[in-house]
Amino acid sequence: MNNEYYDCLVVGAGPAGIFTAIELTRLNKDARVLIIDSGRNIDSRRCPARVTGKCVHCKPCAIVSGWSGAGAFSDGKLSLSSEVGGHITDYIGQKEAAELISYADSIYCDFGASDEVHGLNDKKVDEIRYECSKHNIQLVPCPVRHLGTERAFDVLRAMYVHLVTNTHTTFMELTTAKEIIVRGGRACGAVLEHAGEEFTVEAGCVVAAPGRGGADWLNHTVKNLGIVTENNEVDIGVRVEVPNSIMDHLTKHLYEAKMVYYSDTFENKVRTFCMNPGGVVSEEHYENGIAVVNGHSYGDAARKTENTNFALLVSSKFTSPFDDPIVYGEYIAKLGNMLTGGHLFVSAQII
């Protein structure tokens, strides 16, 4: 296993890692790609809590680790706007960002995503925006393609089957990166660990996309390599669950209403996130023992509930000398866990 060579080594099998492999193999059908992840392949991921309702603290956590990351059990909401989800326009501009979003969306459709896109009725969007403005709330228009939890799994599995069957892509489950190898200022491989054995893989390039579960590893790695980084905002809040009747005047037109409010006293940015009409609230546990909440909804109407849930988040941007917003978020989550005795009556959600 030592000293194998791949054109690209991808650390992390979440959406970023998967799409890296899809694009590379489209550009070069002979490209040899190795994707590693600390979790299992998509067909082997099993979360006991989804059956029993009780987390047994599996290691690695089947909810956040493995092929497709946390997306395997998410409800697959694709936000088709550069106005949400990050700062991509800071790097490539509005026009190119829109083109890339459309391209990524087309790939999801190639693998079986649903045809319906919500939030395209401009007249209704304008009416809702007008009503929001009366309360100093900004509505961020954003078309949404909703796959549903069951279809999201099927789409991500189809990507897995395509890559390992039709391309020169290899997926290694239960494998971690110990160290990225750099020579002459260029990443050219990594020291990996699988089943207690360390081995070296050489690669033409390395893509590090470990997701939330690998944030600590990535932070440690870039510091060791002397890479300068900038922290994004940290969003901390609660997940709210209400009857559908309270939110359906928004969700039946937008599916997910993305709203932003700035508080009067300190002008804190407060926003809605991850809205799930007819959805369910789920419990997740990170490997550091923190219990958190998430939400999802099914595409199948028969599996819809009578409730809508969404996260209500406050954004905080830290400056020097504090430079570890993830630790801050984890600390708040731990306090929430402590106050509830580990139960999810109230829980912080870290984004």
Predicted segments with their positions:
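Residues forming the flavin
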Residues: 2-85, 123-126, 130, 135-351
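Dinucleotide-binding Rossmann-like beta1-alpha1 core, especially the glycine-rich loop
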Residues: 58, 66-118
